[in-house]
């Protein structure tokens, strides 16, 4: 009797999700995974292979099950590392512990070339923006930021002034699910730059525009139980009236194109994202 109950329950479960799968409209994009989902395959030699991908992508309540998996892994089994993404205090971190010396040298060579070619007798400043791993207290592999800073400081042209920004930021300055910093947290950074560069102080934008949900680049790589972020972009009359020229698309655009909030990466709201 017990085996029959288990068998019937399993069959009922499969039938229920088959019916739900037929009734639900297919999704084109997963914003949580930041990718296009498989569509129903055409009838050809690859039909059954593509059908497997389609059924997996269009499974009912897929996002909810991913969230349950993330909760089970992170909370129940205490697994903080997955696909090189580390979870701590509701933040996701991309672990990267190696400094690419060749890349640093290449950067320094480019800076020296630009300095010698285009910036003669100009005031030049350099800042290294730390990623949010710098503010991660846990003992996990991460960049030797002191060594990286030393490599840059000791090899930059002597006429370039270094502006240290590390103490103007904190972990709270970054998104939970993404590598980027939050625009609304950057006033201390702006004030430091203005002070060191002898620029006139300006009013920091105060009009907050919010968009939710924002699933960052790191969220797409792991099944996480962490809640989505809220993107906040700041405006004032000057920003609203300003335009920018997109050299890649060869067109004039507003500072914020709200249509980009509906992109797979909503962070594209900031100067058209990677296109700019």
Question: Language-model segments: what does each one mean?
Answer:
Residues 1-276:
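Extracellular glycan-modifying ectodomains
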């Amino acid at each position: 009797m017990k085996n029959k109950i288990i068998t019937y329950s399993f069959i009922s479960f499969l039938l229920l999700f088959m019916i739900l799968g037929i009734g639900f409209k297919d999704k084109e994009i997963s914003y949580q995974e930041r990718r296009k989902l498989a569509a129903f395959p055409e009838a050809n030699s690859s039909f059954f292979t593509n059908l497997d991908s389609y059924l997996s992508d269009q499974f009912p309540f897929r996002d909810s099950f991913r969230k349950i998996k993330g909760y089970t892994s992170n909370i129940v089994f205490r697994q903080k590392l997955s696909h090189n993404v580390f979870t701590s205090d509701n933040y996701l971190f991309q672990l990267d512990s190696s400094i690419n010396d060749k890349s640093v040298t290449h950067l320094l060579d480019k800076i020296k070339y630009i300095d010698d070619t285009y910036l003669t007798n100009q005031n030049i400043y350099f800042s290294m923006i730390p990623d949010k791993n710098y503010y991660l207290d846990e003992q996990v592999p991460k960049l030797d930021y002191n060594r990286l800073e030393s490599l840059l400081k000791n090899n930059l042209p002597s006429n370039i002034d270094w502006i240290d920004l590390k103490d103007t930021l904190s972990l709270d300055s970054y998104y939970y699910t993404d590598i980027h910093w939050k625009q609304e947290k950057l006033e201390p950074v702006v004030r430091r730059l203005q002070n060191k560069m002898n620029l006139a102080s300006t009013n920091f934008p105060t009009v907050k525009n919010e968009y939710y949900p924002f699933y960052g680049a790191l969220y797409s790589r792991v099944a996480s139980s962490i809640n989505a972020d809220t993107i906040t972009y700041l405006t004032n009359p000057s920003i609203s009236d300003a335009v920018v020229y997109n050299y890649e698309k060869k067109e004039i655009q507003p500072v914020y194109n709200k249509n980009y909030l509906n992109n797979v990466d909503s962070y594209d709201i900031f100067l058209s994202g990677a296109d700019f």
